[in-house]
Amino acid sequence: MVDIIVDFEIKYKDAMARVGKFKTPHGTVTTPALMPVVHPGKQTLDVKKLGAQIVITNSYIIYKNEELKKKALEEGVHSLIDFPNTIETDSGSFQLSVYGDIDITNEEVIKFQEAIKTDIGTSLDIPTAPYVKREEAENDLEITIERAKEAANVKSDLLLNSVVQGSTFPDLREKCAKEISKYDADIYPIGAVVPLMEMYRYADLVDAVMYSMRGLPENKPRHLMGAGHPMVFALATAMGCDLFDSAAYILYANKDRFMMPDGTLRLEDLIEMPCSCRVCCEYTVDELKQMDQKKRAKLIAEHNLHISFAEIRRIRQAIVDGELMKLVELRCRSHPFLLDGLRRLMEYKEDMERLNPSSKKSAFFYTGYESLARSEVPKHLKQLENIKPKNKNLVILPHTRKPYTKYVNREYIKKYTPKIPTYYSNTTNTDYSNSDVVVADIPFGIIPLGLDEFYPLAQNESPSIHDLDSKRFIRDIINNYSKKYDNVLIHRKVIEKFDITNFNLIEDELQLPEAKISDFNRLNDIADYQFGCGAGNALFGGDEDKITIEKSRKTKKIRHVFEDNENIVNMRANDGFLILSDLGAKRLHKFLEYPHNRVVVSEDSEPFALKGKSVFNKFVLDCDENIRRNDEVLIVNKDDKLLAFGKALLSSYEIKDFNTGQAIKTRKWKKEIE
């Protein structure tokens, strides 16, 4: 028996999406990837030339056709369909769902797929239609699970798909995913969702996918079966789907339909060709209409594949740039029912956040109230609790240009005129000279001045004309945050913008604070926000006189922090994160209780970690569940001895599941650790 195991590695992350690579006997596939459906006896398009790294064909059709079967057994499926790269084969489950029965067993179809030398084979699952009775779904599920187990035992020279079923019962989807994961398949398709997409039930599709994801491992690719329209690719990718298969490109073409990233166009309605692909550049609408139907269908199918592959490429780039959710929101606004799907996805904020990177290359653009559910917003509100009040008074100012510390003092403090009532308060107090100062803004609500250069609080934009949902959201944040203070003073613009009540106009002269923050206090706020309450004091000791701060000559931002000429931390220029140095790592390790911020490595990995070598996933024994990609982490052994420190390349959940690839990019000790 040849033990073939999928080798999958994540390269880039955004939301739950992954740009990754997995190896097969016939090549490496970059995900997300589209698998065009290739009919074993009818294919006319060169899908490899159009961009296909991987295709899917039906082993049952080959099995039932004696001529195709003979050639496949003698020459292999790659020769049969003339495709040299990775091939996945379906098992006949689709025919089973259509005709109710097929004349091949689960074991036979696995053995046949091995015999024709496919790269990825599929067990004979039971596709359960949406909205069936629960008893039927449960019975089908048990058969699917049993067949997944049988396939894992039977297969040898084959990468194996195990399909998640469960109809429209979310708990059954999760149960199936957990059960089939026990048998360590190589890829996990999510099946029987085509009817949901055909009925535009995208909210139910999101439930089916997200509950499936809860039970699936992070270290294997996931395939959304039958998802062939480019308008759904971005949403599905954001949920963690890596592979898609499409017969839609030819099915739509046969009906003179042009697929686009935001919908479908009918040839009969067009006066201009819709894109800049070869077909649309070389042919006019009238020429296509006058053409033989078969030739026309082939050309439209080529257009459809071009659009589909272009969308996959755009999604990959959006993941690399940290802009996937902006693209998802754009795509989902192309159809009301897709927007239903996005709004249902908002209910899975915790699932999304645990896999979302802490920092990204691109700014956060607020495009509608759905943006409020993006992982960055709830994470900020959670981390905001790490910063405790320093005074009993709070002053809330409107947003200005960024960074706020450069402009709010000039705009709202120095321009204050006692004769013109400008502020509202919850008390009669007029002395706010000693106050915490924050800015109220969409989408993050409350931004302390010390965090105004930290990602994503410094890197975000929202429209100047605000929607009611965001106003209500920010108002609730302001009201809850204000409860921490005895006296709260709010600028009139904030009161009016967010319709805040229960605050009275102050007509007496006020003593206002200077809306600035010292570099030392900024460092403490960032440390508390990034690592946990009290981390600032642990790192910097509470004595400002002992700390030396070096700034960039060009930007005037903090770059390096020292105590007695020994580097504690550095500040990353692009996102404001604190990067630990030797002394900072030691102090943070001493302060934080186990397992906070820690990655525990095996004994074999200890000497390499001490030398500053990267930590690989297979050597990680445990890690703090709150670790996210791009976080600064401490590397320790099982006895909690500090070995090294560095940047996480994956979230804790991914680190625990993966046995290949890097987990931590380790920073080298400047001095040998004691």
Swiss-Prot record:
Cofactor dependence: Zn(2+)
Top-rank taxon: Archaea
GO cellular component terms attached to this protein's record: cytoplasm
EC id: 2.4.2.48
Active site as annotated: D90
Catalytic activity: guanosine(15) in tRNA + 7-cyano-7-deazaguanine = 7-cyano-7-carbaguanosine(15) in tRNA + guanine
Keywords linked to the UniProt accession: Glycosyltransferase, Metal-binding, Transferase, tRNA processing, Zinc
Pathway as given in its UniProt record: tRNA modification; archaeosine-tRNA biosynthesis
GO BP terms: tRNA wobble guanine modification
Co-factor remark: Binds 1 zinc ion per subunit.
GO molecular function: pentosyltransferase activity; RNA binding; zinc ion binding
Domain PUA: 596-671
Binding site for Zn(2+): C275, C277, C280
InterPro entries: ArchSynthase1/Queuine_TRR (IPR050076), PUA (IPR002478), PUA-like_sf (IPR015947), PUA_sf (IPR036974), TGT-like_sf (IPR036511), TGT_C2 (IPR029402), TGT_C2_sf (IPR038250), TgtA (IPR004804)
Residues engaged in binding substrate: D125, A192
Family indicated by similarity: Belongs to the archaeosine tRNA-ribosyltransferase family.
PANTHER family the UniProt entry points to: QUEUINE TRNA-RIBOSYLTRANSFERASE
Record's function text: Exchanges the guanine residue with 7-cyano-7-deazaguanine (preQ0) at position 15 in the dihydrouridine loop (D-loop) of archaeal tRNAs.
Alphabetized NCBIfam families for the sequence: arcsn_tRNA_tgt (TIGR00432), tgt_general (TIGR00449), unchar_dom_2 (TIGR00451)
HAMAP family: TgtA_arch
Protein name as catalogued: tRNA-guanine(15) transglycosylase
